[in-house]
Each structure stands twice: as structure tokens, then as C-alpha cells.
Amino acid sequence: MIQTETRLKVADNSGAKIVYCIKVLGGSRRRYATVGDVIVVSVKEAIPNSKVKKGDVLKAVIVRTKKEIKRPDGSYIRFDENSAVLISGNNEPLGTRIFGPVARELRAKRFMKIVSLAPEVL
């Protein structure tokens, strides 16, 4: 469960390290976002000479959350960290690599490029 002001790690090689959630997209009073949801973020930490700079405002899709996700078969999945992948306006990732596993829920939300780049889909 990601809400406004949550800090997340970045799971791609776009150059950002830490991002800060500004807004959860999808409804005027939507409070929480989970895996597969799109949020608006601000870059808080970035490596030098990268595609993104500190202070940039971008969209990101959540790929891992500490809060468990219930699956339709009754099982749960949770990760050790909250992570996101930065995306462009047409839902394509800004980076060319994804680090760490991603949840299977991204496939249902039509983020096929992120699923194909990920080393593992859980």
C-alpha cells in the first residue's frame, strides 16, 4: 500500500535511486496504490549524468510492495521493499533493464514490456 509522501526504491536503470510519491492516480480521493498502479513521483536521489535528474516529476508503476497482495487462488505474495519503475507517457519504461523480481499482477495490468524485461516474475 503506497500513499502520498511514500518513498520508493527505483527498480530500473533510468538513473533515479529514490522517488517520492506525489499523487496516486485513478480517482479524485484515491488514497492507496498497490502493485500495478500508476503514481506520480518526484526524483529525490539520482546518479550523475543520467536520463533523470533530482527534482524531475514523472509517472511510475509500482512493481513490489511490502504489504501483501492477495491472489484469486487464496495465496499471498509480499516483497522486502517498496519499488517502482519509471514510465513514459505511453506506459513504456524509461530504463532498459529491470532489477529484481516483479509481481505477476503487472501482466494483467498490460505492462508487458516491464514483465518481459524483468529477470523473474513471481
Swiss-Prot record:
<dbReference type="InterPro" id="IPR005745">
    <property type="entry name" value="Ribosomal_uL14_bac-type"/>
</dbReference>
<keyword id="KW-0694">RNA-binding</keyword>
<dbReference type="GO" id="GO:0070180">
    <property type="term" value="F:large ribosomal subunit rRNA binding"/>
</dbReference>
<comment type="subunit">
    <text>Part of the 50S ribosomal subunit. Forms a cluster with proteins L3 and L19. In the 70S ribosome, L14 and L19 interact and together make contacts with the 16S rRNA in bridges B5 and B8.</text>
</comment>
<keyword id="KW-0699">rRNA-binding</keyword>
<dbReference type="GO" id="GO:0022625">
    <property type="term" value="C:cytosolic large ribosomal subunit"/>
</dbReference>
<dbReference type="GO" id="GO:0003735">
    <property type="term" value="F:structural constituent of ribosome"/>
</dbReference>
<dbReference type="InterPro" id="IPR000218">
    <property type="entry name" value="Ribosomal_uL14"/>
</dbReference>
<comment type="function">
    <text>Binds to 23S rRNA. Forms part of two intersubunit bridges in the 70S ribosome.</text>
</comment>
<dbReference type="InterPro" id="IPR019972">
    <property type="entry name" value="Ribosomal_uL14_CS"/>
</dbReference>
<comment type="similarity">
    <text>Belongs to the universal ribosomal protein uL14 family.</text>
</comment>
<keyword id="KW-0689">Ribosomal protein</keyword>
<keyword id="KW-0687">Ribonucleoprotein</keyword>
<dbReference type="Pfam" id="PF00238">
    <property type="entry name" value="Ribosomal_L14"/>
</dbReference>
<dbReference type="GO" id="GO:0006412">
    <property type="term" value="P:translation"/>
</dbReference>
<dbReference type="InterPro" id="IPR036853">
    <property type="entry name" value="Ribosomal_uL14_sf"/>
</dbReference>
<protein>
    <recommendedName>
        <fullName>Large ribosomal subunit protein uL14</fullName>
    </recommendedName>
</protein>
